[in-house]
Amino acid sequence: MPPSSPSLTKVNKPASTVIAKQNDEREKLFLLYESSGTTAGDDSAAAANMQSQRLSDVDTNCIDHYGFIHEKPLTTMSVNERKQIQNEIKRSERWQKMLQKWTQLTRQSEQLRRRIYKGIPSSLRGAFWSKLLNLDEQLRIHKGHYELLKTKARLTSTYLVQIDLDVHRTYRNHQMFCNRYCLRQKHLFSILAAYSVYNTEIGYCQIVAFLLLYLPEEETFWALSQLITKAPYTTFGFFVPSFPKLFRFQEHFEKIMKKMLPKVYKHFNQYQLESNLFTIRWFMLCYLDCLPFELVLRIWDIYMLDGEQVLLTMAYCILKINRKKLIHLKTFDNLNTFLKNELRQNFGNTTLTYDEIIEELNVCHDKLKQNNLLHLPPLKENEFLTRLEL
């Protein structure tokens, strides 16, 4: 008879050993970001110069107006593009004057609303987002809290490995994030780490790198906090595990489609395309990576002003503008590809300019309002944040 196999006994490591290993992993990650790449220096200076940063190993002809790096040199600017840049410079002068008299304005100011719907100039986008999110007040109220949260994250956050993985793959085609452990990667890691211990019900979310394109580090942290917890944004319900706000928005959008776009709604049903397949990213990320970047910026300008309403209005606007193309697509795969890929590349090959799309967005807003479809049902109980850690 062959000898019996020896029994294997699992030996559990002492809790103190596991904790020590976790502490070491956290410390190593923080040290990587602290010791590599560009040192932080004066963050206000970094923010002021962020639009002019260039990388020595990248042909500047491959970098577009927004800082994204392309494989091939970009074509020479057309006469219209040069004219557009000149117009933006002139607009910036008017916006700068408006910034100086900010205390005299309200969110409902006709001048402010009209100009925001035309798009905030890139050079002043961060300054106006900061004003619309009331970040000066947040920095004053929470003075010193962000540094304390970073220290706490260094000692206790359980999300750091996942955060590091996300930082590694985020916006690597952008001049601010393309070098591993560079300044903006360090800021992104620090903000996500701090937020993971500040709002333990969510941990962290994926819009931070986009905000960092236009805001300095600490302002970005409090911008994230405002967007998640404060009206008219209150995105908390999009990110908690049961996604209550996402489902509420998707249910309401079904009503909008049934009433305002019945042919599109029927067509989608015919090919078993449910709207929740494409609206999940539209609503949770406010169209980030879902539409051309320049158009996304225009939508975010309006989102900073009006909040969550633009999520539904833009969804309706997208389908309304593209309704004829959608109805001519005769398979699930073709419909899904159009909504997930073609819209992101060129808004479905529309002949409309971005200004015209935003004008149509305004029209869609008024139509939803006329049909009592602009306002959603009230928040559900599980959409409210119960605690923040300070």
Please give the residue ranges for each predicted region.
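A generic secondary-structure signal for well-formed alpha-helical elements
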Residues: 136, 215, 231-235
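Contiguous, well-ordered alpha-helical segments that form the cores/surfaces of helical PPI scaffolds
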Residues: 189-194, 206-213, 222-226, 255, ...
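Extended, Lys/Glu/Leu-rich amphipathic alpha-helical scaffolds
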Residues: 84-90, 103-104, 111, 221, ...
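Active-site-adjacent structural elements in folded domains
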Residues: 173-181, 192-197, 250, 261-286, ...
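N-terminal transition regions in large eukaryotic proteins
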Residues: 1-196, 212, 378-390
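Helix N-cap / loop-to-helix initiation motif
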Residues: 121, 216-217, 291-295
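Solenoid-like repeat scaffolds
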Residues: 117, 304-305
